[in-house]
């Protein structure tokens, strides 16, 4: 059995979608804690999409530069507003790599804004 960990970047099949949801097979960052990742098939992920100047100005988007450790091949954005649950047994395509602790702190901050946790809001 694959051990998925918080901060991993995995390719996920996000289809089918409805409305403005992010779709296709694309990289996603695992944001659930490792206790859940080990015990339940449904995990929470943040989709990763191609970087653009417009997307880069959105507070809840986190810029990610490609590296050997994260497995990305181009400058990207973690779109924390598009966070969604997936059943990894059905949707996982492959594991790419892992983000640094510093980058995960940026994603955590963006998620706190999205969900208004700890008094941080828009």
Would you name each region that the model predicts?
Residues 1-122:
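Conserved functional hotspots at enzyme active or ligand-binding sites that engage polyanionic ligands
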């Amino acid at each position: 059995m694959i051990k998925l960990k918080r901060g991993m970047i995995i390719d996920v099949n996000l289809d089918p979608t409805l409305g403005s949801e992010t779709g296709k097979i694309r990289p996603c960052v695992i944001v659930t804690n490792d206790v859940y990742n080990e015990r339940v098939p449904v995990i929470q992920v943040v989709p990763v999409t191609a970087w653009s100047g417009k997307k880069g100005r959105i507070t809840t988007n986190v810029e990610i530069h490609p590296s050997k450790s994260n497995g990305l091949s181009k400058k990207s954005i973690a779109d924390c507003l598009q966070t969604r649950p997936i059943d990894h047994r059905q949707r996982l395509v492959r594991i790419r790599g892992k983000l640094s602790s510093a980058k995960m702190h940026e994603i955590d901050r963006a998620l706190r804004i999205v969900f208004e946790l700890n008094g941080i809001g828009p």
